[in-house]
């Protein structure tokens, strides 16, 4: 069976039998049509317990890539935190108790929705409650979502938070869209807006809920809400404690850096804060206390390949680069021996419906170069289905799928020419459901299954009831390497 192998992850493309508002079905996709006819294929589960999330919870890129790269189901922080709240372990957390004892005033910051991708509203409320019951003066700083949930669902979430704060006697201090607070592409002007707001230097309003409704009236949805503060809020003090409740790291790193790093030079800051506590490890360089430490994941796909002395290439554009490196490698940043990483810059546009092809063709070129060079294993992510799906623009999402289809055709052709095996799958769905029955835009991920195609010597059928955690062993089987005991079985 021994062959070199390409693993292609088509982010945000799932299987939805309903063809209405389904960008995948609506797209012209000759490469996919050929794959369905000629290559063994099946469906994989990418949500709920199949990827270590609560039942019914949609999958996401972080979880999906961890599952694919580690070859096992890792119970995600979302599940771990839920359990810690249920059994009262969270309030006993040593790092939390230290912060509450040290700081009279405490600020809770995070994405407030039930999307479950970066955070959960229930975690936010649990933290407010713990801090308030401890006797601290507590300030809530809500980041509005509109991306992992409906674009105007914020009104209900923020109403819920406002009432919760009032009943608890805590301050509802600021509101800011994730476009500003959770940038991850070093667009520091956006993060600065959030920073200024936390310091009490933003536009002041008497009622945050009314401001949100006014934003909707001006066609500004949750993701893009401009930073605003309650008129009674006076800003953070340097001695205050700050707790970040997002459990996913990639979109909180920049804000933490702005608030805490002494080396930050991107813009002038009035204050730097030392008493920070994050829900999970956002970046090892921060040296900050955390509530939930990383679980150690050993014998990942990338590690096994590296230890065997084989070469590997990991490539994607900026938006998904962390997923094929850090997350795919089990939450480890460091480069492995014989591992090459190629980062293709994402286009500098406000939202990707402006350029649905994104940088797919450049990413495709990097893969073909890797095949021609003879890399033993290549993993690539095409971001289009997900990133354009998040915009809610149906026509742009169709173009996104068509761009991916073109790239698949080229890579498959190149793989066959050089006798490479290939596996094509997705980490989760998105663009296959762009509107609901009422015509509301759907910008979030789905819970639908995803396609998997396997072209390799001796493979004619894929087993039933498989998931993303069965892919790593499949790659090792193709490469003729021993499958570690920590991994789930192969797809074939």
From Swiss-Prot:
Pfam families from the UniProt entry: iPGM_N, Metalloenzyme
Keywords: Glycolysis, Isomerase, Manganese, Metal-binding
Chain sites annotated for binding Mn(2+) 2: 11, 61, 427-428
One GO MF term attached to the UniProt entry: phosphoglycerate mutase activity
Requisite cofactors: Mn(2+)
Annotated positions binding substrate: 118, 147-148, 178, 184, 248-251, 320
Binding residues annotated for Mn(2+) 1, in chain numbering: 386, 390, 445
Top-rank taxon, per record: Bacteria
Catalyzed chemical reaction(s): (2R)-2-phosphoglycerate = (2R)-3-phosphoglycerate
EC number per UniProt: 5.4.2.12
SUPFAM superfamilies xrefs: 2,3-Bisphosphoglycerate-independent phosphoglycerate mutase, substrate-binding domain, Alkaline phosphatase-like
Cofactor note: Binds 2 manganese ions per subunit.
Stored InterPro entries: Alkaline_phosphatase_core_sf (IPR017850), BPG-indep_PGM_N (IPR011258), Metalloenzyme (IPR006124), PGAM_B_sf (IPR036646), Pgm_bpd_ind (IPR005995)
Keyword hit for Metal-binding: yes
Function: Catalyzes the interconversion of 2-phosphoglycerate and 3-phosphoglycerate.
Quaternary structure and partners: Monomer.
Family label: Belongs to the BPG-independent phosphoglycerate mutase family.
Name used for this protein in its record: 2,3-bisphosphoglycerate-independent phosphoglycerate mutase
Organism: Campylobacter jejuni subsp. jejuni serotype O:23/36 (strain 81-176)
Name of the gene: gpmI
